[in-house]
Amino acid sequence: MSPLTAGQAGTSFTIDYEQPGSGQLRARVTGRRGGLETLLEYWYAIADEARRIGADMLLVVDELAGDPLPPEQLQGWVGAMAGQGFEKFRIAYVEADGSRIALLEMAEIHAREHGYNARVFGNESDAAMWLRHGER
């Protein structure tokens, strides 16, 4: 799969896709973190690719540089994801910067309240294990 490079003014990101197994999509996101619009842009791109290949499990590895969104924008992000089909995916999200895990766990709680089967992890091996074998 060829990578996607995109981003708005002042931000840029690249998504490298792999298919580690049947029904799975691994998306590694690198580059510069932007605002809510950038976050939505890369998540929509990942969902499009997952639908294109027929994946139902997403492993998203976030290696973006820059400051995370504030909590109120993370809540807005969860709401903006409605109607995009994310409810159909099992999503394991890996945050490379361990200091951000607590903030992202709040987003995980909001996502679960909105019907998403998603978890946040600090490392890829735990995320991959949950994706394949964790509680459904």
Mark where each language-model region is.
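Amphipathic, Lys/Arg-enriched alpha-helical "gate/interface" segment within cytosolic domains
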Residues: 2-136
